[in-house]
Amino acid sequence: MAKLVLVRHGKSEWNKQNRFTGWVDVDLAPEGIEEAKKAGQKLKEAGFCFDICFSSYLKRAIKTGIIILEELDLLFIDHLKDWRFNERHYGALTGLNKDEVKAEVGEEKFLLYRRSYDVPPPPLSEDDKRHPRFDPHYKNFPVELLPNTESLKDNQIRAMAAFHERVAPLLVEGKDVLITAHGNTIRGMVKELDGISDEDIPKFEIATGIPRVYEFDEALHIKNVYNID
């Protein structure tokens, strides 16, 4: 039975500062490094041995993957990066303090931007230096691929496209796959995998550093789902 394990990266420096991070390549905080180590240790204790790891293009997810693989003594396996596993793009909210945004726009609009399924925050202008087209990570990407804002639904669509294209075929082959990514990215994936409604997904939380395990049969039907915490 093939296993898929989703892990949200450990706490980042901007998580600590309560800022909207999105595609900004913020590093892990010391606490986040420890969270990643503990995730790897828990997976080792539970007997996991992965065939391949995927991460986003962002260092907080990449480093989380590396730390987990090191704890499992699996640094030799393929560790592939796919931008479609990036965090949701927060548009004009990128880099702003969440409490300050809430005070400015009001709680109702703040929750709509932050937690709703299909409402994106205000977009970045194309000449805003926070736009991904100015980021060297994406210098070879067609500009039309790069978002200036995203809803959770947008995030889910691109992440699940990567899942169906790259991950699902490996699970069908019986491979065990680790994905280290981001809170909204994983929330969107869980929504589709678990069949969570648009109304219920805003209340669903993804904790940092807690592995979420899916067990699949040969037909890619989910047979079991659980967290290792």
Curated annotation (Swiss-Prot):
GO molecular function: phosphoglycerate mutase activity
Binding site for substrate: 8-15, 21-22, 60, 87-90, 98, 114-115, 183-184
Site (Transition state stabilizer): H182
Pfam families according to UniProt: His_Phos_1
Keywords, comma-separated and alphabetical: Gluconeogenesis, Glycolysis, Isomerase
One of the GO BP terms on file: glycolytic process
SMART domains registered for this protein in UniProt: PGAM
Top-tier EC class: isomerase
InterPro entries reported in the protein's UniProt record: His_Pase_superF_clade-1, His_PPase_superfam, Phosphogly_mut1
EC number: 5.4.2.11
Catalysis performed (reactions): (2R)-2-phosphoglycerate = (2R)-3-phosphoglycerate
Catalytic residues in the record: H9 (tele-phosphohistidine intermediate), E87 (proton donor/acceptor)
Keyword Chloroplast part of the UniProt annotation: no
Pathway stated in the Swiss-Prot or TrEMBL entry: Carbohydrate degradation; glycolysis; pyruvate from D-glyceraldehyde 3-phosphate: step 3/5
Keyword Isomerase: yes
Entry function: Catalyzes the interconversion of 2-phosphoglycerate and 3-phosphoglycerate.
Family per similarity comment: Belongs to the phosphoglycerate mutase family. BPG-dependent PGAM subfamily.
HAMAP family for the chain: PGAM_GpmA (MF_01039)
Subunit structure: Homodimer.
Protein name as it appears in the record: 2,3-bisphosphoglycerate-dependent phosphoglycerate mutase
Lineage of the species this protein comes from: Bacteria, Pseudomonadati, Campylobacterota, Epsilonproteobacteria, Nautiliales
